[in-house]
Amino acid sequence: MTHYLILESRDPYDSVDWGNIQEMIINLKRNGNDVTLFLLQNGVLPARKSTSFAKYFADLEKLGINILADFFSLQERGIQEIYPSVEKSNIDQLIHLFFMPNTKIIWH
């Protein structure tokens, strides 16, 4: 089985194709792949508890998609509270994910 590691560095507020990438993530999972969504840089912005993305992240979690957010990116943007379906992570874990067997990486 292929593991897709999706690096999301763009936020939905200024990226017109953000929705298309998220649809691709869901389709990859529905087609039987393992999927990890790693939010970094401005990609962490929708993970803030005050945004309207709670249902979106909960739906991804229900599908079995792992959602990680880079701690440094959160800290740099002053984000302390994130949705429960999003786990704080770091670059060390990201590098570990790079080297998992059968992993394909997509950066957006």
Question: What do the PLM-derived regions correspond to, one by one?
Answer:
Residues 3, 30-36, 66:
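Residues at the starts of beta-strands that form the adenosine-phosphate
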Residues 77-107:
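C-terminal structural segments of small proteins and small subunits
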Residues 3-19, 41-48:
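Short, glycine-rich nucleotide/cofactor-binding loops
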Residues 19-23, 50-56, 88-89:
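Charged helix-capping and loop-helix junction motifs
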Residues 15-32:
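Histidine-anchored nucleotide/phosphate-binding helix
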